[in-house]
Amino acid sequence: MDIYRAEQRILHLLAQGGRIDIEKDENRKITAVACITRDGWRAGGLDIVLFRKLKRRRCIASTGGRPYRITQRGLELVRSQLDNQ
């Protein structure tokens, strides 16, 4: 399955140890998402539509209320790059 450039960028950051933080409203609906790199910087390019697409493809998952991380399926989809760890 091919993934688009924006998805590839986010998955690459997550493969290096990044995470996705979410904000919810009082009805527990997701209102905002932010991709945080392993260094603690906020990366651009992630919106709610892209977040839902990655979640639907099972590339990211959250366990126990923790931030979203890349899954094994996401690691298989991300193309290797020289600085991936």
Model feature map: region roles:
Residues K55-G65:
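A short, conserved structural fragment
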Residues A43-G44, R52, R56:
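Short, charge-rich amphipathic interface segments used for partner binding and complex assembly
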Residues M1-I48:
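Short amphipathic alpha-helical interface segments
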Residues L75-Q85:
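Short, amphipathic alpha-helical interaction segments positioned at domain boundaries
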Residues A34, L50-F51, C59-I60:
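Short hydrophobic/aromatic segments of transmembrane alpha-helices and their interfaces
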